[in-house]
């Protein structure tokens, strides 16, 4: 197997770690992991420590935040990525070369746009499978929220682009849904890591949290000003800061580290996050109350 992983946030990286472990335990081999990168994201240390296959990087499209660093700025993101098209074409050429040179028999795509475009333009002979909760958005029975029709169309269009010419789409879901053979979608349970299933959760006194965009620190601090007695421990991707930023006795920010993150999740009172998928599944599995604050249209749908 060859993995191609979108490098935005923690979720797709966590899925790749979990699936590699599952495949290896069943006698399969992951020959290489290709991870998309951009100027605004660095690869978290926990990924390099946890994944066993060789990791290679390629330049990939990414979404730029608004000036307050909370939600995605769609117009700015579109303009930025159009300017980067020559680099993305080089990345597609590189992905095609790695598919050939690794001798992989199957490619697994973790919602990376350039995988779909590579298969559209270069037509590799190796079959590929897409995996991610986002493929539920293409399922005939998925219920969308009452949001902008244009943004919902763009979300579904982007999701289709990640899966051009794919053999199958594995849609991760909390609940069971029928197969959608017309769209080659099979609904499967979330990829929960063995570390989570082995944890004995306890109820602590603090709120555990994760924010992809550090701009949400303003919101956290507003809550903290009103409720200074509530301990808050938030993880973020703000790489230019110390490993732990301790604001005061009851508020601290931590660089994303999976072992510390899972321990924090296991012993917290409740979990607060942008409305991603993987960490929400982990919190639900451990029986923790969850607060979700959507940061973009995909998370509105989540």
Which sequence ranges carry the predicted segments?
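A short, glycine/small-residue-rich beta-strand->loop->alpha-helix junction that serves as a flexible
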Residues: 5-17
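Conserved nucleotide-sugar phosphate-binding/catalytic loop shared by glycosyltransferases and other
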Residues: 7, 25-83
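Short, polar loop motifs at secondary-structure junctions
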Residues: 35-41, 111-114, 172-177, 234-243
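An aromatic- and histidine-rich active-site surface loop
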Residues: 42, 107-122
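Conserved nucleotide-sugar donor-binding subdomain of glycosyltransferases
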Residues: 69-106, 113-114
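A donor-sugar binding/catalytic signature common to diverse glycosyltransferases
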Residues: 107-110, 262-302
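Active-site-proximal region of nucleotide-activated glycan assembly enzymes
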Residues: 122-187
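Donor-nucleotide binding loops and adjacent catalytic segments primarily
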Residues: 189-268
């Amino acid at each position: 197997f060859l993995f191609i992983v979108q490098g935005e946030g923690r979720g797709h990286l966590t899925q790749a770690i979990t699936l590699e472990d599952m495949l290896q335990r069943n006698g399969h081999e992951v020959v290489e992991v290709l991870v998309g990168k951009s100027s605004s994201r660095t690869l978290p240390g926990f990924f390099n420590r946890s994944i066993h296959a060789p990791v290679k990087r390629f330049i990939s499209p990414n979404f730029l935040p608004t000036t307050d660093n909370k939600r995605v700025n769609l117009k700015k993101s579109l303009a930025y990525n159009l300017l980067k098209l020559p680099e993305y074409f080089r990345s597609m050429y590189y992905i095609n070369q790695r598919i050939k040179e690794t001798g992989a028999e199957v490619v697994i795509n973790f919602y990376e746009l350039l995988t779909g475009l590579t298969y559209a333009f270069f037509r590799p002979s190796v079959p590929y499978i897409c995996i991610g909760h986002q493929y539920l958005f293409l399922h005939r029975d998925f219920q969308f929220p009452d949001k902008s029709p244009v943004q919902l169309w763009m979300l579904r269009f982007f999701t289709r682009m990640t899966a051009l010419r794919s053999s199958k789409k594995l849609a991760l879901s909390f609940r069971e849904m029928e197969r959608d053979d017309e769209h080659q979608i099979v609904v499967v349970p979330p990829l929960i890591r063995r570390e989570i299933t082995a944890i004995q959760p306890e109820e602590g006194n603090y709120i555990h949290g994760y924010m992809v965009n550090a701009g949400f620190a303003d919101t956290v601090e507003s809550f903290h000003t009103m409720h200074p007695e509530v301990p808050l421990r938030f993880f973020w991707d703000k790489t230019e800061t110390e490993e732990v930023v301790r604001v005061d006795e009851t508020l601290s920010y931590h660089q994303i580290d999976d072992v510390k993150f899972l321990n924090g999740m296991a012993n917290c009172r409740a979990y607060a996050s942008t409305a991603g998928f993987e960490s929400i599944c982990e919190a639900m599995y451990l029986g923790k109350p969850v607060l979700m604050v959507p940061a973009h249209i995909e998370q509105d749908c989540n």
